[in-house]
From Swiss-Prot:
The gene is flgD. It comes from the Bacteria. GO terms for biological process: bacterial-type flagellum organization. Keywords: Bacterial flagellum biogenesis. Belongs to the FlgD family. This is Basal-body rod modification protein FlgD. Required for flagellar hook formation. May act as a scaffolding protein.
Length: 236
């Protein structure tokens, strides 16, 4: 049996030159993405490698159509996913910008948020509230000082789920005006003698909006810092 030796130098291949891609020379893409993650540039780099692979393939074992189709499908899938990710990122950034603009309008406004402390100014009424997650057969609300002395006591019956607002006149149980400062608020809610979830709510003034790791934090000064989702009500 005779043997035939095939040398790739004896075969004339098309003179296909892979395109030279210079990321610095590539025209800036329209979506302002870096060239190494921009879908059109991913395709250019892939085609450059594919052409080089075809030119340097083993003539005795050429690339099969199925392999070529598979590689093209992979780059199309990767390109499509990159485009989708870029679109989602741009959409998320736009939502964040719009949210920041809306939150900036809260500066100087009073908001009601979950809090176990209220800030009282002497000789003025202080607003506060409770948030019930289900109907309660009894509710007890207390305002106390740092010595645990009860200054305000209110008892309710058959209270529906939801938010309920109240005002404290700043007087203790003996009708004496208390000093300005922070006071504690506690709420016990029951349904048929079983404790049920309840939040105490206080009012704070929005001092500023702080961006932290892409998230908005609302600074309420003495009332602390909260997230936008903590706001239960924006007061007039």
């Amino acid at each position: 049996m005779s043997t035939i030796n095939i040398n790739s130098s004896d075969i004339n291949l098309p003179n296909i030159q892979p395109p030279i891609i210079n990321n610095e020379a590539v025209k800036k893409n329209d979506n302002n993405l870096p060239n190494d993650i921009n879908p059109p540039d991913l395709q250019k780099n892939f085609l450059s490698l594919l052409i080089a692979q075809i030119k340097n393939q083993d003539p005795t074992d050429p690339i099969k159509n199925s392999d070529l189709t598979s590689q093209l499908a992979q780059i199309n899938t990767a390109s499509g996913m990159q485009k989708l990710n870029n679109t989602v990122d741009q959409f998320s950034n736009q939502i964040s910008k719009n949210q920041n603009i809306q939150l900036s309008t809260l500066i100087g406004r009073h908001v009601m948020v979950p809090n176990k402390k209220i800030i009282h100014t002497k000789d003025t009424k202080t607003q506060f509230g409770i948030e019930l997650f289900e109907k309660a057969t009894s509710v007890e609300i207390k305002i106390t000082d740092d010595n645990n002395k009860t200054l305000y006591l209110k008892q309710l019956k058959e209270t529906e789920a939801g938010r309920h607002n109240f005002f404290w006149d700043g007087q203790d149980l003996n009708k004496n005006s208390v000093m300005s400062g922070q006071y504690n608020i506690s709420v016990i809610a029951k349904k048929n003698n079983q404790n049920i979830p309840v939040n105490s709510l206080s009012v704070g003034v929005v001092n500023s909006i702080i961006m932290s790791s892409g998230n908005a934090i609302i600074d309420l000064g003495e009332s602390g810092q909260i997230t936008p989702l903590s706001i239960r009500e924006i007061l007039k």
